[in-house]
Amino acid sequence: MEEQREILEQLKKTLQMLTVEPSKNNQIANEEKEKKENENSWCILEHNYEDIAQEFIDFIYKNPTTYHVVSFFAELLDKHNFKYLSEKSNWQDSIGEDGGKFYTIRNGTNLSAFILGKNWRAEKGVGVIGSHVDALTVKLKPVSFKDTAEGYGRIAVAPYGGTLNELWLDRDLGIGGRLLYKKKGTNEIKSALVDSTPLPVCRIPSLAPHFGKPAEGPFDKEDQTIPVIGFPTPDEEGNEPPTDDEKKSPLFGKHCIHLLRYVAKLAGVEVSELIQMDLDLFDVQKGTIGGIGKHFLFAPRLDDRLCSFAAMIALICYAKDVNTEESDLFSTVTLYDNEEIGSLTRQGAKGGLLESVVERSSSAFTKKPVDLHTVWANSIILSADVNHLYNPNFPEVYLKNHFPVPNVGITLSLDPNGHMATDVVGTALVEELARRNGDKVQYFQIKNNSRSGGTIGPSLASQTGARTIDLGIAQLSMHSIRAATGSKDVGLGVKFFNGFFKHWRSVYDEFGEL
């Protein structure tokens, strides 16, 4: 479809803008080359799954932290005429009676984008896709300084979720995240995003097996998984003693001067101007299409940049189709932080950004309070999170007829004990949505002797009262530093989510009072 072609072209341009700015002549040449390539290769979504997979790989590589991901989506939304609304502002004058396309951001890591039709009313509810954008990572400690160990420079870090295990050893790790700084002569604190890619600045070395039992693990996460960042010599460039000006930074003494100088240079500020920082370590190796028949996509941080990416691209594709002056629908993608550590933060699913957006935007739109109970009773929330592909090396852990395989379609997550929010009506609704959109649906449920993971689904269901359905794109090697999915699965996710926005209201109406 034409609108999906335009989205892919814009996505490519946005990804390029987030790297090195080319010269004008090179930029024109590249744009002409892209246009020609797109004219030859891009027709409709179903025939270009590999193109979408490659765009996803580039997106993952160029946006290694949650801050970068949300910033990227914000820029993409800007380019597609979504209007930014500050949470700190009054929305009454920003959302008119004609509705429109909007987004807001909390903490730089929690984003909600929405489309509000002119003819919407409370009885029409809201069509929601909720996902999480955080991924397992390693965090720099507030005081990361460590004395050198026989000349080795090291930094103190802490696991975010289930990391700093054997899977993180011997990986090329970059560093990136958000810096807060205050320029000299001003009182305004600003932020900057930094990213060392493609340079791996550190590594957590394993112990050779020749040393016997100490090399076997498990390893102490405090003392045996410390990243090594260098082996500096006294006379090398950049190893000069800290200057009096550098000592003025609140971070001086908390982090090694080499690291402070490095990240300050990335941000284009001076060490003395640094106020605070939130930095992650991450695998810098770029993802790739793999398998002898190109059936797979291998990349880091799939959980859950996978569903987040597919959902946001689907919303933007849908926005190209919808005329807000004629529409009676309210559609949103809301992306959360901190799912991997329980969601109980202001930027997590339990922080209530979705509920806030619906309440504030609906009352600004109607110019009067809206009965939110009516809104949520008529709404559908898709809790989109990755689930588990069948691993052929461990067939005994899977429930027969309840596991997905690659490159087939979206997977419903089911659990009779409430770890997933999907109910029988939700299952039937998804199957009908898939039928209308030409998609296939797979099931995933654990065996009785296994434990279930969790999603944001039960939280959103209990906080809103809306019917909530847990589903997602399936992957192998969940919570590994590198994982895999089907090479068609990103595109299949975009296709299904786009169909959800188009059809959810008419399908849900068929269920009446159920």
From Swiss-Prot:
**Which residues carry attached sugars according to the database record?**
107, 110, 448
Give the E.C. number(s).
3.4.11.22
Task: Give me the residues that bind substrate, please.
Answer: 210, 339, 385, 388
| Ways its activity is controlled | Strongly and specifically activated by Cl(-) and Br(-), which act as positive allosteric effectors. Inactivated by metal-chelating agents.
Cofactor binding notes: Binds 2 Zn(2+) ions per subunit. The average amount of Zn(2+) bound at physiological metal concentrations will be lower than stoichiometric.
* Reactions performed catalytically: Release of an N-terminal amino acid, preferably a neutral or hydrophobic one, from a polypeptide. Aminoacyl-arylamides are poor substrates
UniProt site positions, description: Cleavage: 45-46
Would I find Cytoplasm among this entry's keywords? Answer: no
- What processing steps or modifications follow its translation? Synthesized in a precursor form (prApe1) that has an amino-terminal propeptide. The N-terminal extension of the 61 kDa precursor is proteolytically processed in two sequential steps. The first step involves proteinase A (PrA/PEP4) and produces a 55 kDa unstable intermediate (iAPI). The second step involves proteinase B (PrB/PRB1) and converts iAPI into the 50 kDa stable, mature enzyme (mApe1).
Q: Which domain of life is it from?
A: Eukaryota
Gene3D superfamilies, alphabetized: Aminopeptidase i, Domain 2, Zn peptidases
Modified positions (Phosphoserine) in chain numbering = 356
GO-annotated biological processes:
cytoplasm to vacuole targeting by the Cvt pathway; proteolysis
Principal EC category? hydrolase
Q: How does activity depend on pH?
A: Optimum pH is 7-8.5.
* Protein's cellular compartments: Vacuole
The residues forming the signal peptide are: none
State how it assembles. Answer: Homododecamer. The precursor form of aminopeptidase 1 (prApe1) assembles into dodecamers and further aggregates into higher multimers (the Ape1 complex) in the cytoplasm. The Ape1 complex is disaggregated in the vacuolar lumen, but mature aminopeptidase 1 (mApe1) retains its dodecameric form. Dodecamer assembly in the cytoplasm is essential for formation of an enzymatically active complex. If cytoplasmic homododecamerization of prApe1 is disturbed in mutants, homododecamers of mApe1 will form in the vacuole, but they are enzymatically inactive. Interacts with ATG19.
> Could you share any additional remarks the record makes about this protein?
Present with 5730 molecules/cell in log phase SD medium.
Q: What does the UniProt function comment say about this protein? A: Resident vacuolar enzyme that catalyzes the removal of amino acids from the N-terminus of peptides and proteins. Also acts as the major cargo protein of the cytoplasm-to-vacuole targeting (Cvt) pathway. The precursor form of aminopeptidase 1 (prApe1) assembles into dodecamers and the propeptide mediates the aggregation of dodecamers into higher multimers. The multimers are then recognized via the propeptide by their receptor ATG19, and ATG19 further interacts with ATG11, which tethers the APE1-ATG19 complex to the pre-autophagosomal structure (PAS).
Protein name (database record) = Vacuolar aminopeptidase 1
Natural source organism: Saccharomyces cerevisiae (strain ATCC 204508 / S288c) (Baker's yeast)
Q: Output the lineage of the source organism.
A: Eukaryota, Fungi, Dikarya, Ascomycota, Saccharomycotina
Q: Which gene encodes it?
A: APE1
